Amino acid sequence: KKNNVYVIGHKNPDTDSICSAISYAYLKNELSQKQEEGAKYIPTRAGHINEETQYVLKYFEQEAPLYVNDIRPQVTDIEIRKTAGIEAGLSLKKAWDIMRGARIVSLPILEDEKLAGIITVSDIAYSDMDVYDNMILSKAGTSYKNIVETIDGEMIVGDLDGEFEEGHVLIAAANPDMMEGYIEPQDMVILGNRYESQLCAIEMDAQCIVVCMGATVSKTIRKMAKEHGCRIIVSPYDTYTVARLINHSMPVRYFMTTDNLITFHTTDYVDDIQEIMAKRRFRDFPITDNQGNYVGMISRRNLLDLERKKLILVD
């Protein structure tokens, strides 16, 4: 599209104006092919076609030139960054890995190709600051698949289907007698290789226990866990690392911005969006097409590389 050149006549075009645009665009395209310029010349018109011109076009079996009522640069004339969208259930860790790898600060969340929200580096940083809510993992409806992937673990009892929907996340740092006082049914307990602690958590109806340091889990504990409907995840990391990582398994939908999103359409004029972009603190702005499908992202920097439409005026 950057190589498009529009050949256009005056407003309220007559037959001469229309035929001039068609013939000159044809000539330029022929010369462009021979000279290997790569430019594409498109005949256009700045008004509606009268009856005389319609008759001439029909007689010579020519299509009417493209109607153009405004040649101001549009969003489609900007280099739109094709940032791939992610699913709302993707973990914060995976979203961060994508942003770090692509060197970007925001990602669009899509549902059926439509924009559902935006997750930014700031949102991920905010998720790390809420350290006093030990139920946030269940409030976010975190999937067990995300949990296992985030802590590089293995589910050795139970399956990956389902979500951690209720309960606290606790670390079994005390002896079993004290554990009985703070573990509640449906909790998730992070612990080590102590048999007594594992057994206590299961008997207290924990929903899941996370065994750290890749410790071996005995057959007795596995059997007890199956009988109580308790999942067992084994992670190679130490307790501190698991405790830090596990919150990064939460889905991005819990932290993404969904309200007051500033989006632009591919047909919007650059003049109209510049002022909006200047007043908003957002780094990136999502672009959608006429069907509302997500196309990509632009930033203020993209406006610096704007290439205006090229015209040839004829009559």
Task: Name each model feature, range by range.
Residues 104, 108, 114-130, 237, ...:
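Short beta->alpha transition motifs characteristic of CBS
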Residues 66-98, 110, 142-195, 200, ...:
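Bateman/CBS regulatory modules and CBS-like beta-alpha motifs in cytosolic regions of diverse proteins
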Residues 10-12, 46-49, 112-114, 121-124, ...:
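Short, ordered loop/turn segments at secondary-structure junctions
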Residues 42, 65-67, 107-108, 189-191, ...:
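Short hydrophobic alpha-helical runs that function as membrane-insertion/retention elements
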Residues 15-21, 198-200, 218-219:
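Short glycine/serine/threonine-rich phosphate/pyrophosphate-binding segments
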